[in-house]
A protein has these predicted regions:
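Compositionally biased intrinsically disordered regions enriched in Thr/Gly
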Residues: 27-272
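C-terminal motif of bacterial Sec signal peptides marking the signal peptidase cleavage site
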Residues: 22-25
């Protein structure tokens, strides 16, 4: 049986809106800005270097305060950007927003700290939420970030995962959308390249090989704007239950640069 959560496009649209609006800036409650790596909690942050980009790995975890036995739990494994506070704040904001994969559970919060307070007041004994953010790659001016959440609800058969990519342009201080990365008018060619990548992915999918017609009817190709620019091309991520059953996780399709010439803007292609 297929299950449907909030469409990926809804999350992507919010993220771009948040970027346009230029979002600024261990115990029972994480630091007010968990991803800002407060100096008062040095053990929770670890400086790291990704290419020429300075980052800090931020970790925090807690059960519900005062709870014994089966307790609600939150774990955060995020990333901060000491030289780009706007990006640090955006990562925090988007991770919190991504808990709205189930529209009925979207609460009045905008940061991880606010989400934590909401979660402690509403969670059932075995509920848990896991947050993870990391740099996927850096390509020239662009920093690609992978944001992931997974929610485990008491009584549910399995977790609800969600993954979102952000492509941050350092020179412009903003998120780059897919349409901004494509040459104007080349959206159709991008979709065709994505379909070819999907066809290659199906060739390696034992369920699809077993009964291609039935699989294609149940799990047809879909477009996606959820992309990350990497040194090998672009990677496109899909939600669970979108183009494959839950057992396949969140499928990922790769389009090499060789298939993106004449589609992706020249300044984003590898230079000879």
């Amino acid at each position: 049986m297929r299950r449907t959560f909030t469409p990926r496009g809804a999350i992507s649209g919010f993220i771009l809106g948040a970027a346009v609006m230029a979002l600024a800036g261990c115990g029972s409650t994480p630091p007010a800005d968990i991803t800002l790596a407060p100096q008062s909690s040095p053990a929770a942050s670890t400086p790291e270097k990704v290419g020429d980009l300075a980052t800090e790995r931020i970790k925090w975890a807690s059960n519900k305060p005062g709870c014994e036995g089966d307790c609600p739990r939150i774990e955060i494994d995020s990333v901060a950007f000491p030289g780009i506070p706007k990006l640090t704040a955006l990562v925090d904001h988007v991770l919190a927003y991504m808990t709205g994969t189930d529209a009925n559970r979207r609460g009045p919060y905008d940061t991880l700290s606010e989400y934590t307070q909401y979660f402690w007041s509403t969670a059932r004994p075995r509920d848990a939420t896991y947050f993870k953010a990391s740099v996927k790659d850096t390509v020239g001016d662009v920093v690609s970030i992978e944001l992931h959440t997974e929610q485990f609800l008491t009584g549910a058969a399995h977790g609800i995962p969600a993954t979102q990519y952000l492509n941050w342009e350092r020179s412009r201080g903003r998120v780059m959308s897919l349409d901004e990365a494509l040459i104007p008018g080349r959206r159709g060619q991008y979709v065709a390249a994505l379909q070819r990548a999907h066809a290659k992915w199906l060739e390696q999918n034992p369920d699809a090989r077993r009964d291609p017609a039935a699989y294609g009817k149940m799990w047809p190709f879909q477009e996606s704007d959820n992309f990350a620019l990497t040194r090998d091309g672009i990677v496109v991520k899909y939600d669970a239950y979108s183009i494959a059953p839950y057992s396949h996780g969140e499928p990922e399709l790769s389009i090499p640069y060789a298939d993106l010439r004449g589609i992706l803007k020249p300044e984003l292609l590898p230079q000879p």
